[in-house]
C-alpha cells in the first residue's frame, strides 16, 4: 500500500466567508481530484520554522476528504486549538492512498481500509511523540500508557536493565 504527501494547505484562521471553497480551490489547483480521495490528514499549526501536529484523522467517506475534514465537530476542534495558539498558522497535510500501479489515487474503500486505519494510528502515535497535547481522544490509550523497558514510554525510576539498554539500541537508527 502506498500513500503520497500533499501540502501543507493553509487554512483561513478566521473561517471567513467562503473559506471552504477557497481551501478546496487551492487543493484542486495543486492536484485535481485530491479533495475526493480516501486518505489520512493532519491538522497542524506553524509558528516560525516549527510545525506541530494537533489532530490526525482519516476518511473513507464516499464524499472523500471534502465530506469529512470540515464536519462541524472537527472545525470546533480546530477553533479550540487555534484559540490557544493565536499567533500560529493553521495548515492541513493530506496523505491519500495511491494505487500500487501507475501511482493514481485509490478508490478502493474496502481493500484500503486496513492500510488507512494503520496509517492513522501510526500518525497519531508519531504526533503524540512530538505534541502530547494533540486533540485526538481515540487511539491514544496505548501510546500514552504502555511501557516497554528501553523501547516505549517513560522510564520508571532507577537504572535501565542491560536488556532494556540493548532493546533501546536495537530500535535506534
Give the location of each predicted region.
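Boundary/linker segments flanking structured domains
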Residues: 1-54, 60-173
